[in-house]
Amino acid sequence: MAKSQRSQIKNEDISFVSQEDDSSKKFVKDDSENSEEELEDLNSEDEFYQSNSSEDEIEEEVQESTIADDIADILNQQVTQTDEQDTPVLSLSKKSKKALRKSNAEKKDSKLRTSRRRERLRKEMVGRVTSVVAVNAETAKALFTHERELRRIARRGVVQLFNAVRTAQLQSSLNRENISGGRTAREQKVKELSKASFLDLIKSQ
């Protein structure tokens, strides 16, 4: 009886062990299948990351190249002489520096000319009445009438002056033919006659 029980226990152990082996084998098999799938997934993920990293590197290279091109364009850009605010800050070419120096020199010259002109105009305007401020209409009318009279007198005096000069020239040319003597004496007499006749003509007017 005891032997039969021992044999049954051994058989049960053996069968149990065999069941565990089968299950363990199945489990191991399943693990192997899962590991293959995981490896495939990992490989695909590595390829994906590699592709993404390569794309990122390409984008970075493109960005670096565009930035370098932009900086080179700015450095080689010519500076305009019209407006310094529109010029690039990083302009370092020799032509640009020469243009900047030239524009600065021209600006200094123009400022100097403007200051000299203002000073000259200021000196010319000393003692000059630029505007007449009238108290009322009667005062303004009187001032305009006086100004008109002064202009008429000045115009008449200029006309008389030109007439006197013209007549003096004609008389001196006529008297030159009638004067005798040497060249120097004749020139002296012409000067005296022309001066005297010119003054007489002005007084007679």
UniProtKB/Swiss-Prot annotation:
Ranges of biased composition (kind: Acidic residues): 33-63
GO CC, alphabetical: nucleolus; preribosome, large subunit precursor
UniProt subcellular location: Nucleus, Nucleolus
Pfam families noted in UniProt: Rrp15p
Sequence ranges of Basic and acidic residues compositional bias: 22-32, 103-112
Family annotation (InterPro entries): Rrp15
Chain residue ranges for the region called Disordered: 1-63, 79-118
Family: Belongs to the RRP15 family.
Protein name: Ribosomal RNA-processing protein 15
Source species: Schizosaccharomyces pombe (strain 972 / ATCC 24843)
Higher taxonomy: Eukaryota, Fungi, Dikarya, Ascomycota, Taphrinomycotina
